Amino acid sequence: MIENSPKYKHSKNLISSIYLFFILTLIIGFIIANTQFLGNSRDYNNYIQIFSGEEGGGILELFYRGLMLITTNHKTIIFIILTCSFFIKARFLANYSRNFSGLSLFFIYYACVALWVLDYTQFRNGLCISILMFSVYYLFINKANYFYFSVLCAIATHWSALPFLLLYPFVYSSKIRHLGYFVFSVLVLLAISGEGKEFIYFIRNFGVGQKIGNEAGVNLINSLSLTAITWFIISYISSIGNERRFLRLFFCYGVMQYVTFSLFSLPVMAFRILEMYFFLMLTIGVFIKQKKNYYFIFFKLLILFYLTYYYHMVFGVINVSG
């Protein structure tokens, strides 16, 4: 399924070049994120409290609990997290880059958006998504054991990876998939009917839900969800053969999560899902076959430019303090 034809070989030099630029970006990003060069990001003070042991870590993921048994120096822990995150990304791209245009788009998105949203600000989520890059690849080539191992590693770095445990059977088992559609329909009806208030309260106040939920609302349709839908449509149209089915089921699973969390007023988790699945759709574009169409690439570039504007100018991801 992965592109290995003779026509591809001539582009290896181009891929090598863009990969070198990406490595340079990783190195610079690693330094900037570790030093908080532009000032402390909006989440940095929270991480100081968590990793210094000032805030209770009862629901903190296993990886960080382990690190805190060794040290409670927040700078050391953040350094380890970022080292792992950057190394995993570099290793993945070194092993599985097959599509020059997909790799280029990934590079642009990372340099303009993901570096700042994830590695500069959301350290834990950034490490989790880096590991999930391998998960979607193993899902794509139908390697169940490797898929579950990588997902468990991702869960150990961020609870938002928990739903990925059901992704493999959703993609490869029609019975599980139809059961998933049924459960999703029930949850949607429950939320729309207003009968799910007690269930929402339970989620928000039980364990992990204390972190992923809050009282704010979230609009199901917004600029970020629309950009994700548009990106999927373009990617789906430009994909070839079995890649279409894989991409469709992967995106469908993400949509069901996003809709569920949105309807049950869990905005933190809903936007985590948007960030995660958009990043992973770009990751998939690195190793699948796609039709060469400059119009598709142009529209994808417009989406990336909008996201750059949104995160930096509207959302203010580098909303630094002292």
Model-assigned labels for residue ranges:
Residues 1-28:
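Start-transfer (signal-anchor) and selected internal transmembrane alpha helices
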Residues 11-20, 34-65, 163-279, 312-322:
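Alpha-helical transmembrane segments and terminal signal-anchor/GPI-anchor hydrophobic tails
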Residues 66-81:
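Juxtamembrane segments of multi-pass membrane glycosylation machinery
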Residues 80-99:
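Transmembrane-helix motifs of polytopic, lipid-linked glycan transferases
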Residues 93-113:
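Transmembrane-helix signature of polytopic, membrane-embedded enzymes
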Residues 120-126:
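Short acidic/glycine- and proline-prone juxtamembrane loop motifs at membrane-interface regions
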Residues 132-146:
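Membrane-interface transmembrane helices that cradle and orient dolichyl/undecaprenyl
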Residues 151-167:
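Transmembrane helices and adjacent periplasmic/lumenal helix-loop junctions
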